[in-house]
Amino acid sequence: MRVHVVDPPAYTPPYDHALSSALAAAGADVTLVTSAFPYGEVPRGDGYRLDERFYRRSAGAPGGTLRRLTRLAAHVPDMLAYRRAAAAADVVHLQWLTVGQVDERLLPRRPLVLTAHDVLPREPRPGQVAAQARLLGRMDAVVVLSEHGRGRLVGEVGIDPGRVEVIPHGVLDHLTHVEPDPLPAELAAVEVPVVLCFGLMRPYKGLDVLVQAWEGIGDAELWVVGRPRMDTAALHATAPPGVRFVERFVDGGEAAAFFRRADLAVLPYREIEGSGVLATALAFGLPLLLTDVGSFPEVAATGAAELVPPGDPVALNGALAGLVGDPARRRALAAASAAAAAGPYAWGPIAERHLALYARLVG
């Protein structure tokens, strides 16, 4: 089975590489077709080819206007060139397509699968939701990461339920194999329990609720770590004692150090489907505190997490206080987290489920 895993903008490189490696280990002939990730080195797996053919002439700083414009200018010719190259694949498995209004006209003439990492855009531009629905309708199959996502695809988008396949987000364990860097001196000196909120800082992640919920939590620290994609001035202005911000892109050994130091991972999101941060925390066997959104309840059902309602600082405060003060409860959650990483969220069975889907499409 010749499989192309395709992520033109390189939005989820850890997932892309983990899936490609797992498919190759399960016997597929895999090529990951993507662009160079602009924020640092991405650890590669084994057994697959890497083709960074998209946006090779991008200019400007990552996230900047010039870079967006040069990538947009290259998008159509790069997609057309890939459509020709896709003739070498039995199945094309798309991860992200960023210009839906155009992409639906540029799809390869091969069996097509799309993983709906976001069922619908969270911050849609005019016409984007309709374009996404049309794009999903062009797929031979759509993979979603949870039963919640399946319900939305069928109920809100109108996708034929027979074309929707639920396959969870596998654990992202690449950082568990990385030698951790030393933490900055002011963080290395912290001796109390650390609650970690990691990843890009964006409005939908509920950081304002988390900072409000930290009020009154003693004998612990909250570390909010990641590159801001929002104005964080209000967070700093309202943060109670014990909150530290590390506002930059963190990866590699430094990211490993943060996850290894954490006593609890918190994801206070207002909405989400699947989460790479959650998949990484599972790989480290961390106890989890999650909001009741997207795929998170399915993770909590394994015993790895406690759940609180989204947007509820009072409930979040109570859960934080309870877990910070109860090491035995954290240990129980951590044991379940490690078991989930080795069980339902392990890449071996996830790859087999993908290959079974591909085989049905090829016939």
PLM regions with names:
Residues T302, E306-V314, G322-A328:
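Conserved acidic donor-binding segment of nucleotide-sugar-dependent glycosyltransferases
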Residues P124-P126, V154-G155, G162-R163, G170-L187, ...:
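Acidic anion/phosphate-binding donor-loop and adjacent secondary structure
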Residues A233-A256:
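Nucleotide-activated donor-binding/catalytic signature segment of Leloir-type glycosyltransferases, i.e.
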Residues V6-A74, R83, G100, G149, ...:
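N-terminal strand-loop element at the rim of the active site
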Residues A257-E273, A283-L286:
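Acidic donor-binding loop of glycosyltransferase active sites
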Residues V171, F198, E221-A234, R248:
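Glycosyltransferase donor-sugar binding loop
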Residues L187-K205, V211-I217, L222-W223:
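Conserved donor-binding/catalytic core segment of Leloir-type glycosyltransferases
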